């Protein structure tokens, strides 16, 4: 596993981002054959498998994709929407997105900027921590499958 070279306070967003990037890079180095992760479910709390949960390969590709954005910055909004939608958007979807965006703008004007920042900052911190754990679980599960458990 890669060692963090920068030192920030424990709960600093930069620390969480660095930790996430390091864990995903470690996952990429350990998982030599990603196709082995197809159709393997990540067990939930108590060892139970959730119905409809994504397989480990889906987690692997998602975690790598998010890591690229964490390391290199956001894609332009149009590229991101096209990527998510698979380049298939209809007029109705565009109208719904514009309506949703207008609603978000109205709500955001009502909240003060500091409260918005705190909400998004806490959410980002929580999500990155959760994704870091998922990357560790994918790595551990792959090691178990290939007999690399130490």
Swiss-Prot record:
Phosphoserine PTM sites in chain numbering: 90
Record-level Gene Ontology MF annotations: identical protein binding; molecular function inhibitor activity; protein homodimerization activity
GO cellular component: cytosol; nucleoplasm; protein-containing complex
Pfam families cross-referenced by the UniProt entry: Spot_14 (PF07084)
Origin: domain of life: Eukaryota
Gene Ontology biological process terms, A to Z: lipid metabolic process; regulation of lipid biosynthetic process; regulation of triglyceride biosynthetic process; response to bacterium
Gene3D superfamilies given in the database record: 6.10.140.1610
Knocked-out gene: effects: Decreased lipid synthesis in the lactating mammary gland. Milk has reduced triglyceride content, causing reduced weight gain in nursing pups. Adults exhibit reduced body fat content. No effect on lipid synthesis in liver. No effect on the expression of thyroid hormone-induced lipogenic genes.
Region ranges (Disordered): 83-104
Location in or out of the cell: Nucleus; Cytoplasm
Signal peptide, first to last residue: none
Keyword annotations: Cytoplasm, Lipid biosynthesis, Lipid metabolism, Nucleus, Phosphoprotein, Transcription, Transcription regulation
PANTHER family: SPOT14 FAMILY MEMBER, THYROID HORMONE-INDUCIBLE HEPATIC PROTEIN
Self-association and partners: Homodimer. Heterodimer with MID1IP1. Interacts with THRB and PLAGL1.
Protein purpose: Plays a role in the regulation of lipogenesis, especially in lactating mammary gland. Important for the biosynthesis of triglycerides with medium-length fatty acid chains. May modulate lipogenesis by interacting with MID1IP1 and preventing its interaction with ACACA. May function as transcriptional coactivator. May modulate the transcription factor activity of THRB.
Protein name per Swiss-Prot or TrEMBL: Thyroid hormone-inducible hepatic protein
Organism of provenance: Mus musculus (Mouse)
């Amino acid at each position: 596993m890669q060692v963090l070279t920068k030192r920030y306070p424990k709960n600093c967003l930069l620390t969480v981002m660095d930790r996430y990037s390091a864990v995903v890079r470690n996952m990429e180095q350990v998982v030599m054959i990603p196709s082995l992760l197809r159709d393997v479910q990540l067990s939930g709390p108590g060892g139970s498998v959730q119905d409809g949960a994504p397989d480990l390969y889906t987690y692997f590709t998602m975690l790598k994709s998010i890591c690229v954005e964490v390391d290199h910055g956001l894609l332009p909004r149009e590229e991101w929407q096209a990527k998510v939608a698979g380049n298939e958007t209809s007029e109705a979807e565009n109208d719904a997105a514009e309506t949703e965006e207008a609603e978000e703008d109205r709500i955001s004007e009502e909240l003060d900027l500091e409260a918005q920042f705190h909400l998004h900052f806490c959410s980002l911190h929580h999500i990155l921590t959760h994704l870091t754990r998922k990357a560790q679980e994918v790595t551990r599960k792959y090691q178990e499958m290939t007999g690399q458990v130490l």
